[in-house]
Amino acid sequence: MITDIKELERKVQEIKYKCLELCVNAGHGHVTSAFSSAEIVTALYYVIMNFKIDEPKWSDRDRFIMSKNHGSVITYPILQDLGFLGTNSNIAFMEDGSPFGTHSKESVPGVEFSGGSLGIGLGVACGMVYALKMNNSKSRVFVIIGDGECYEGSIWESIMFAGHNNLDNLIVFLDRNRMTITDYTENMLKLEPLSDKFEAFGFNTQEVDGHNVEEIINAVNCIANNGKPNCIICNTFKGNGITSMSNKLFKHGVAPSGEEAEKALKEIRERMNNGI
């Protein structure tokens, strides 16, 4: 567990650097989607969640579901760094026969969900919380959904289910980067007012800067104990931290190459070296 915020911020940069290396070497990967949720995932694994590295299926652990599963590459360096993958582990990202693909697989230690189509992970998370509550477990389930993912009807079915069943052990992080592949969400199909919509379905809601680890941690610590599920809307930018990719359209699913890749890696490396 990391207790110092500056150290945690530096860890975010370290994880981003390793994530970008994986995608650059593979020539593919959802870099921008991974980077918009990097601070959320890092704060979860290094500060917020309870788990046992040497016992990945410990019954009282907190669970994490990356519903916007194409961004799962950000979790691989974290699992490696924490020791879930064993000593001297190698992440063979996008290689034939490797479990480390653009979408997560449960066969990877520490991964709770084999991902695929959008809109599925939140329903899985709701089912987990429902089962945990039947067993009187206090374990929490954290899930990241994308704002573009909110165009899936199954997301709203899951939200309705969570509110109706008072799934208060559910914490949803909504990665509000306001972008899809080709346009901004509010141009394509308006999502706002998202906070009001979640509250109408019986959720507690908060809104934070999704690139501020301290705000993310404080939001989890301030969750009301009132029997309601929770949504933390995280305002983010796709590709945050890479000048050539941040908040840029048509960068979805694209790994930088050549000079752009070199500049991106240098940009992150400089922040790491400066302790940011």
Where are these regions (language model features)?
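N-terminal hydrophobic or amphipathic helices/low-complexity stretches enriched
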Residues: M1-I15
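N-terminal capping segment at the start of a domain
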Residues: V12-H28, D175-N177
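Cofactor-binding active-site loop characterized by glycine-rich and histidine/acidic residues
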Residues: L22, A34-H164
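Structural motif
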Residues: G27-F35
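Histidine-centered active-site/metal-ligand motif
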Residues: H30, H70, G101-H103, H211, ...
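Glycine-rich beta-alpha junction loops
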Residues: E39, H70-G71, N177-R178, N212, ...
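Thiamine diphosphate
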Residues: G110, S114-A224
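Glycine/aspartate-rich loop-and-adjacent alpha/beta segment that forms the canonical ThDP
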Residues: V213, N218-I276
